[in-house]
Amino acid sequence: MAESYKQSGVDIHAGYEAVERMKKHVNKTMRKEVLGGLGSFGAAFDLSQLNMKAPVLVSGTDGVGTKLRLAIDSDRHDTIGIDAVAMCVNDILTTGAMPLYFLDYLALNKVDPVIVEQIVKGVADGCAESECALIGGETAEMGDMYHTGDYDIAGFAVGAVEKDAYITGERIAEGDVILGLASSGIHSNGYSLVRKIIKDNNLDLDAEFDNGKTLLDVVLEPTRLYVKSAKAILDAADVHGMCHVTGGGFIENVPRVFVTDGLYPEIDVTNIPRQKIFDLLQEKGSIDKMEMYNIFNMGIGFIFIVPREAVEKVRSAVNEEVFEIGRVVRGDKAIDIKGV
């Protein structure tokens, strides 16, 4: 059976094995609101069990970009799924929505059940950390579309927030304080440039780079998930706005939160913790220092904008350092970055 299909480049038996291998990882993400199991035509989630008065659903989709190239070339597939989850759930968090469920799309040149299991395990790990059910997905074997060994992954997250708690940025006011939580490194943006710098400078990815980690370890460090920290802060303090510092860095992302004319963020980068990887990229890539803030997160992955009186509540809500990196000022700029 299925020999003709296999000869055309699609091995359905390898697909069956991959599904069996991923089941135990998917099952650890399940929530009581999920109806049915893996393999249904459609995935169902019972919103009535959330006991929310006026839930607003918030969705997001994203991929991992060319960070995948490094993962594939180094045969490290077990954390790239975490990146896919983080890129989606961190985005929807900015509205105050907590993730409910996640779907993934994995397209490959050829289904290798072992590699597929590693990738999906990463997705499941990210979902479990985010208290988000991996409710469904698609694994597509497309030999004519991808080179040997190559694959792509994308994710889709849905979360919910009470309508009266939905954060739009409209409450951001002059004098508000801009607070940041540390990133885990580069996260999942700017990797076309990262890879070019590595290639142009013939950097040794296996060389020890920082705190016993190799350079490869550092550049493949998975994107940090901010769900638990954001939930703790939202429960403890009045938050006027949030920002996921993703593609485009500070310069593109922070202004997105400012929907009221006449206000802009003033960022003091001297208060941002320095990470060795960004110094390396800036030096080896001969990148203008200001441009670095238009590409990378530079050490801060998630931002909260709060009134001055809420700052200590934010600090007390999480078991980590909270960095005061700026303030909201009046004027017609998009953003002002000081201390570069």
From Swiss-Prot:
Q: Where in the cell is it found?
A: Cytoplasm
Which UniProt keywords are present, listed alphabetically? ATP-binding, Cytoplasm, Ligase, Nucleotide-binding, Purine biosynthesis
CDD domains in alphabetical order: PurM
Q: What class of enzyme is it?
A: ligase
**Catalysed reactions, semicolon-separated:** 2-formamido-N(1)-(5-O-phospho-beta-D-ribosyl)acetamidine + ATP = 5-amino-1-(5-phospho-beta-D-ribosyl)imidazole + ADP + phosphate + H(+)
Q: What is its EC number?
A: 6.3.3.1
- One GO BP: adenine biosynthetic process
Provide GO CC annotations from the record. Answer: cytosol
Q: Sorted alphabetically, which InterPro entries does this protein's record hold?
A: PurM-like_C_dom, PurM-like_C_sf, PurM-like_N, PurM-like_N_sf, PurM_cligase
Among the GO molecular function terms of this UniProt record, one is: ATP binding
The protein's annotated pathway: Purine metabolism; IMP biosynthesis via de novo pathway; 5-amino-1-(5-phospho-D-ribosyl)imidazole from N(2)-formyl-N(1)-(5-phospho-D-ribosyl)glycinamide: step 2/2
Q: Which family does it belong to?
A: Belongs to the AIR synthase family.
Protein name as annotated:
Phosphoribosylformylglycinamidine cyclo-ligase
Q: Which organism is it from?
A: Macrococcus caseolyticus (strain JCSC5402)
Show the taxonomic lineage. Answer: Bacteria, Bacillati, Bacillota, Bacilli, Bacillales
